């Protein structure tokens, strides 16, 4: 029986993955900043077949007591087989309109929080003989994306840390899956930070036409089960990842033409 901890579990990809693991009878730990939304997801997970559901609300914009959060999660199900580091925040501002306060907030949520959790979980997983760590990055972590300077930076940074973790601890039984979504129908654009740090408030048209969260969750959970190093999730927008690799000049030109909304 799997024990699975999912951050960013109150909506979108995290919520959809929670339901898939619930249907497998997993023991679930659900974390996000919204206790109310988490309770609703937890209710559905129990109805879907989860053996146990624990709700641990946490605001990742302030990570002062993250060690206590990790300890609570580990103790709740007496160990964790899989952690999905999925919580995140985006933005819709150009470089000029992006304050350093906004950059720091994005980095705190998107980079420092998952890194801190992974570092704190690692010795526990090693003592237990291994474990699986999945982290949600983005195609915006593979090439610069307009109106996403802080967001792209945080996702680029995740690649560096978690690819290193893959290399260092593979032989010790730690499997790291880097999840790279393109456009998926989630609330991330609604809660993205606009100029002044206020929520963007709408789903971007490109995102609205993207893959459903349920379809994304199926791809992601299958990749984690197979121990894949990386999984690309999306549709035609994923072509940019390959264009960047083989035709970087063309990628730079296309990035300038992207409609960022």
Kindly label every feature range from the protein language model.
Residues 171-235:
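SDR active-site lid
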Residues 138:
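Residue(s) in the substrate-gating loop at a strand-loop-helix junction
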Residues 10-11:
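Conserved glycine-rich cofactor-binding loop
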Residues 48-64:
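Rossmann-fold cofactor-recognition segment
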